[in-house]
Amino acid sequence: STIQTSDQNEKQDIASATAKELNVAKKLSTLFKTFKWKDKVAEKGDKARTHTGIVAQEVQLAFKEEGLDASNYGLFTSDTWTNDDGKEQTRLGVRYPELFSFIFSSIEARLTALDAK
């Protein structure tokens, strides 16, 4: 397994999630879906496996709906390259460990609010 550096001495601007970020995280927790990769369906047909995950475009929209830019967060990725035909291509993605941490922050905030009642 990979160890993620988490040393306070290597971080700055350490803060709790804002209300808008917590709203995004709550929304993201509802967006997980099952799907099949198109290239695997083309290769394997009905034998292509089903996966569980989130759609990066929906992640991007959830941030936008709260007035935030997903590209400012490490959980969201956007890679652009030029294909063999000279056309620019973009692929969006997520870093699941960061996504799960982000979502966990909203769960913890909701539990804390419930405990306070």
Language model features: what each stretch is:
Residues Q4-K117:
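Intramolecular chaperone/auto-protease modules of tailspike-like proteins
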